[in-house]
């Protein structure tokens, strides 16, 4: 009030995100991880974690959800993942048990220690995950191409179906691998890419790729 205002200094557009007390977005959980290092508001993750993961702060028991992550620095075992609350993130790699899945940069998708090969990624590529918590179906994408000829909007071509009560985004980095997640906060991934400004069907989020029809950002307004 009284025309007393702060003047922004040394701020870029990507330093301002829609996350707020009235609509809180998922980030990576700083206390639910095994040896990972976080930056950029707990959206960037690195660290040489051979057996272990980091989960997100917001999960879902029902509904359809979408998130994405940019592979800033390539390492083949670095993975975008999903896990439930029962997974032991301190001793398991993503997809080692039936309690998590992981899509690795080198092209392998893991579930219950079984691997299926899809497209590999390189630095600058973008991982995508869409999941339906009601049916347990999971889709994975690379640069807006859904693997296994998947079509999340139509419910076809999922890479895995699981029976979980609770779904949480997760991450695993190995060696020099670096991932920058976007749960709808910043489609430029901290200025590493050109922002694309795609919202979900409720008008929430700032995604690089448009979420599939019927899939939404993990935020408190959508829950």
Residue ranges: model-predicted function:
Residues 1-223:
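PRY/SPRY (B30.2) beta-sandwich protein-interaction domains
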């Amino acid at each position: 009030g009284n025309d007393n205002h702060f003047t922004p200094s040394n701020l870029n557009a990507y330093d301002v995100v829609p996350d707020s007390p009235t609509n809180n977005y998922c980030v990576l959980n700083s206390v639910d991880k095994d040896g990972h290092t976080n930056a950029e508001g707990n959206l960037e993750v690195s660290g040489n974690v051979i057996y272990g993961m980091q989960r997100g702060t917001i999960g879902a028991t029902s509904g359809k959800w979408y998130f994405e992550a940019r592979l800033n620095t390539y390492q083949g075992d670095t993975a975008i993942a999903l896990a439930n609350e029962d997974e032991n993130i301190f001793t398991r790699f993503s997809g080692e048990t039936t309690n998590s899945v992981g899509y690795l940069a080198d092209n392998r998708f893991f579930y219950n220690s079984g691997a299926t090969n899809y497209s590999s990624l390189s630095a600058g590529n973008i991982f995508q995950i869409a999941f339906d918590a009601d049916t347990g179906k999971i889709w994975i994408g690379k640069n807006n191409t859904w693997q296994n000829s998947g079509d999340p909007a139509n419910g076809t071509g999922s890479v895995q179906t699981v029976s979980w009560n609770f779904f949480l985004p997760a991450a695993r980095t190995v060696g020099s691998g670096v991932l920058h997640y976007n749960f709808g906060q910043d489609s430029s991934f901290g200025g590493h890419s050109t922002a694309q400004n795609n919202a979900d069907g409720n008008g929430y989020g700032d995604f690089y790729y448009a979420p599939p029809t019927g899939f939404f950002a993990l935020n408190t307004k959508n829950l």
